A protein has these predicted regions:
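Boundary at the C-terminal end of the N-terminal hydrophobic targeting segment
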Residues: 31-36
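Lectin-like carbohydrate-binding module/patch detector with strong preference for beta-trefoil
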Residues: 37-214
Length: 706
């Protein structure tokens, strides 16, 4: 009132001009106030790069979680309902549940980074199908796979979108009254609502706790105990220097059934093997011959969840490295694996010929192509395990390429995986191949850049790097197929025990009529059967080049499978250059004449390399370890010897101890790190080391304890 009075009092004393000026000023001020009152609030600031990144990466945190999907528009939840029809029993999803209690609850199973399959309480998949429908799917696969996006909201929360991989369309909710899917429909395409009016693509995820877990192998270990350590202290634990995680891709990818992981889960990774092995394993010719010494061996091919006959220690053509089994081995004290990428062009071409399953879309038998694929698979496996455990870098399975990386990974409580190559035609340098220093160098650089750090210069057969350790029988047939010649032998030197060879074409050279034909065409080699023999070939000039380049690059030279002449020549180079990166990873060198370790073994120990016996039951394995430990006694190096499984390398695994029935490994047991481990369960099968030996890689934990 005082202000009004004052204005009026002053106004009475003003001239008309002054009065008009004041009036205009007051009117302008009033108009300004009206404009200020009608102006819209400033829009919120766009999210920062850090906020966008946090929302995007929050998708990783959904792994193995349980959530209800809620509409931000009306607060309703997705629920399953019967829409009728034949597809997926007429079941689909909509947004009509008024509470989380009545909503569908989805288990989020990662398939890769940012990609998930969602299964409800009954194991039905949030899925899509042709032509453009959402349904409660019954099967894993790309139509049940969604790329999930995380989106930052102004209140600091996140919303999530779902892009279907099978149809390449986004999941939507129609909360309005227009269109085929009006009033709560979940859809990907609505021709009656082409502009997607009153629909949304971003949803709230409300945490729940009563989902049905996705099928998976159990670890059966106490996961509460940390395996972290001080990176500056010595590493304690076990290493397996000879494994073949990716051997399911060698020999055309149609020999070893199963995968260590699958985006679609264990039901796909460890499915029935009849698709490549035929009914009752009738087409599993190499597996039956090598594992059971009987090409007519028959077995029940069923896999998950029953596993009536595989995995087993003699079942060489079935997957034993499922990723959860590998994780269990890590929990049991295994700190590092050398995963050898493997190929054998002869066996690959034989398999592609004799097994009809290999006639359709087999992998390339060329060694370099096969190795490339296996490197890709190991990287995919690392990413898959990361996705299961919370995103990039979070998984226990870590590819490493330096000692420092390996030590850091182990200190972080994870497993270090080092890549190597074991192939008879390394770098496409079989006897019949065109191979030069230039082609070798190009391939060497390529695999080094991919993370490979260990190589076998020779494997089963002679190649352009040198002579292989001689073997008769099936391997000698392979030598002939690979090189055009059988093993050409000579009397061994006085320090070396060789192998006995039988004259004639291996396996069939004594068969009447066939023998005469083979003699006629010169395919019945003649050997001195009175004494053990050695390969007459040693290290070639190209082999000298390769070994020196490996030393230049700090790579590990695998000595196994070398002829004694080749091995002696390599050790001369290694000793001259004072190099320690040499290893006999699975006891596949010739022994001394009296059966004791060869001078090559002693040379490896003296240089600071690694010696590892091939695995066997714990009672006999001790002798193999002691045999090599003695070679380190007079050296300055760590007195330690690992064992190698060579699982996946077409070699039988360790059986149970002969006294396991009366003196069994007791379950549960406590590891050196204080982790409690019980019998491993996968699906409906329980594995017990006492009964079946090393049936799969998860039992390495049990074997270490034994």
């Amino acid at each position: 009132m005082i202000s009004t009075f004052n204005i009026r009092y002053r106004h009475s004393l003003m001239t008309p001009l002054a009065s008009m000026t004041v009036s205009i000023a007051l009117l302008s001020a009033a108009a300004g106030n009206v404009h200020a009152m009608s102006k819209k609030p400033a829009p919120p600031a766009p999210p920062s790069a850090a906020q966008i990144s946090a929302a995007t990466n929050s998708v990783h945190d959904l792994a193995q979680g349980c959530y209800a999907i809620q509409s931000p528009a009306n607060g309703k939840y997705m629920n399953r309902f019967d829409q009728g029809g034949l597809v997926d029993n007429g079941l689909s999803y909509q947004f009509k549940a008024t509470s989380a209690a009545s909503a569908a609850r989805f288990y989020f199973k990662p398939t890769s980074y940012f990609h998930y399959m969602l299964t409800d309480q009954d194991g039905r998949y949030l899925a899509s199908h042709l032509p453009n429908e959402v349904s409660a799917g019954r099967y894993a696969g790309k139509f049940a796979q969604w790329r999930v996006g995380g989106h930052f909201q102004n209140d600091g929360s996140y919303r999530y979108s779902f892009h279907g991989i099978g149809l390449n369309k986004v999941l939507r909710h129609n909360y309005g009254g227009i269109g085929w899917y009006a009033n709560g429909g979940a859809y990907v395409l609505d021709i009656l609502n082409p502009t997607n009016a009153n629909s949304e693509t971003g949803f709230n995820l409300v945490a729940q706790n009563d989902c049905k877990p996705f099928p998976e192998a159990d670890l059966n270990v106490d996961e509460s105990v940390s395996q972290t350590s001080d990176v500056n202290l010595p590493v304690r634990g076990a290493i397996d220097p000879h494994t073949h995680i990716t051997s399911y891709e060698f020999m055309g990818g149609k020999f070893l059934h199963g995968e260590p992981f699958s985006p679609w889960g264990i039901e796909t990774a460890l499915r029935d093997s009849k698709e490549i092995h035929g009914p009752s394993g009738a087409l599993d010719l190499i597996g039956n011959l090598m594992g059971f010494n009987d090409v007519n061996h028959r077995y029940d091919t069923r896999g998950y969840p029953d596993f009536p006959e595989w995995p087993a220690r003699q079942s060489l053509s079935h997957m034993q490295y499922y990723y959860k089994w590998v994780e269990r081995a890590h929990k049991g004290g295994l700190k590092m694996m050398v995963s050898l990428l493997v190929e054998n062009e002869v066996l690959c071409n034989v398999q592609k010929t004799i097994n009809p399953a290999s006639w359709i879309n087999p992998n390339n038998c060329q060694t370099s192509k096969s190795i490339d694929l296996q490197i890709q698979r190991l990287n995919e496996m690392e990413a898959y395990i990361d996705a299961q455990q919370g995103g990039p870098g979070e998984g226990f399975f870590r590819l490493v390429s330096t000692p420092a990386e390996a030590r850091q990974v182990i200190a972080d409580g994870k497993m270090a995986i080092l890549m190597g190559i074991e192939a008879s035609e390394l770098f496409d340098c079989g006897i019949r191949d065109h191979c030069t220093k230039e082609t070798i160098e190009a391939q060497l650089q390529k695999v080094y850049n991919a993370g490979v750090r260990t190589l076998y210069p020779t494997h089963r057969f002679d190649n352009q790097f040198g002579g292989a350790r001689q073997e008769d029988g099936f391997i000698n047939v392979g030598q002939w197929l690979a090189t055009g010649r059988f093993f050409e032998t000579e009397t061994c030197d006085a320090e070396t025990r060789g192998r006995y060879f039988k004259s004639g074409f291996p396996l069939i050279g004594d068969v009447p009529v066939i023998k005469d034909i083979l003699n006629l065409i010169g395919l019945n080699p003649v050997y001195d059967e009175s004494q053990p023999l050695c390969n007459q070939y040693g290290l070639s000039d190209l082999g000298v080049y390769l070994v020196n380049r490996m030393i230049d690059m700090g790579m590990i030279i695998e000595m196994d499978h070398m002829s004694t002449k080749t091995a002696n020549a390599v050790m001369e180079i290694v000793q001259a250059r004072n190099y320690s990166g040499v290893i006999s990873g699975h006891s596949w060198l010739n022994s001394a004449a009296d059966g004791s370790p060869h001078a090559v073994h002693q040379g490896i120990a003296t240089q600071g390399g690694i010696l590892a016996p091939y695995n066997s039951p714990s009672t006999s394995l001790k002798g193999g370890i002691d045999r090599y430990l003695a070679l380190y006694e007079n050296t300055a190096y760590l007195k330690a010897v690992p064992f190698s499984t060579d699982m996946g390398g077409i070699g039988n695994q360790a059986p149970a101890r002969s006294d396991a029935a009366t003196n069994p490994l007791l379950y549960p047991f406590i590891t050196e790190e204080g982790i409690e481990i019980d019998k491993q369960v996968t699906g409906n099968r329980t594995f017990d080391l006492n009964n079946e030996g090393l049936a799969h890689y998860g039992l390495v934990a049990d074997h270490i304890q034994d």
